[in-house]
A protein has these predicted regions:
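Flexible, glycine-rich phosphate/dinucleotide-binding loops
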Residues: 13, 47, 144, 176-178
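Short glycine-rich anion-binding loops that position phosphate/pyrophosphate groups of nucleotides
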Residues: 96-99, 141-143
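N-terminal beta1-alpha1-beta2 submodule of the flavodoxin-like/Rossmannoid cofactor-binding fold
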Residues: 1-94, 100-110, 114, 191-197
Length: 197
C-alpha cells in the first residue's frame, strides 16, 4: 500500500500558502491512489524541540548505557524517522522566513539526521540510508529569489544527505508583491501539481 507523508511548517498552519499547496498535492495524490494512505505532521501545532547537548548525547550514547530520559529522546526521534521510512512520497510545505526555512523544520531535520540510522559515513563521504523515496517540496516566498537560493539548496542538500535524491521543488514566489503576482504564482504551482500527480 502506497503511503504519503505530508509535512507542513507554516506558522499559519492549514491556512498558509505552502500548507495549502501541500494539501492540494496530497488530496490529488489520494484521489489517484484510493488505496493509499496519507499521514500528516504539522510542525507548528506539534513543534519538535530544538537540539541541545542533552538530546545530542542521547543519540550518541550506546543503547545499553542510555538513561530513561535518553531512551525517551531517542524513541521520539525514532518515531519521526519511522514516519519517513514508511512513506513512499514525502510532501513538504515550506515558507521562507528571514531567507531560510522555518526554525521548526530545522529542529525536525536535526532529529532526523542520525548517524547509523538515516545516514552513514563512508571513505567516499556520507551516504544516505533512506533511499527509494520521492519528495515534492512547495516553497512559498513573499518576493522573488529564484530557484538557486540558499534556502532551496539547503532543503535539497539535506534530503540528499539522508538518501532522498528524487526531489521535485515547486516555487511560488512574489506572494506579497500584489494580488496579480500572487495569483499568477499560485496558479502556476497548482498547474505543476496536476502535472506531478
Amino acid at each position: 500500500m502506497a503511503k504519503l507523508l505530508k509535512i507542513q511548517t507554516s506558522i499559519f498552519q492549514n491556512d498558509g500558502q505552502s500548507s495549502l499547496l501541500a494539501e492540494q498535492f496530497a488530496s490529488d495524490w489520494q484521489a489517484r491512489n484510493p488505496g493509499g494512505q496519507v499521514a500528516s505532521r504539522d510542525l507548528t501545532a506539534e513543534p519538535v524541540p530544538h537540539l541541545d547537548l542533552a538530546r545530542f548525547q542521547s543519540f550518541i550514547t550506546p543503547e545499553a548505557e542510555r538513561s530513561a530520559e535518553q531512551k525517551a529522546v531517542v524513541s521520539y526521534s525514532d518515531a519521526l524517522i519511522e514516519e519517513i521510512v514508511e512513506a513512499d512520497v514525502l510532501v513538504l510545505g515550506i515558507p521562507m522566513y528571514n531567507f531560510s526555512v522555518p526554525s521548526t523544520l530545522r529542529a525536525y531535520f536535526d532529529h532526523i539526521a542520525r548517524a547509523g540510522v538515516t545516514f552513514q559515513y563512508t571513505p567516499e563521504g556520507p551516504e544516505g540510508l533512506l533511499k527509494g523515496k520521492k519528495a515534492v517540496v512547495f516553497i512559498t516566498r513573499g518576493s522573488h529569489y529564484g530557484e538557486d537560493h540558499s534556502q532551496t539548496a539547503f532543503v535539497r542538500q539535506f534530503l540528499g544527505f539522508i538518501g532522498i535524491t528524487d526531489v521535485e521543488i515547486v516555487h511560488a514566489e512574489g506572494l506579497a508583491v500584489g494580488d496579480e503576482a500572487r495569483e499568477k504564482a499560485l496558479g502556476a504551482a497548482r498547474k505543476r501539481i496536476s502535472q506531478l500527480v
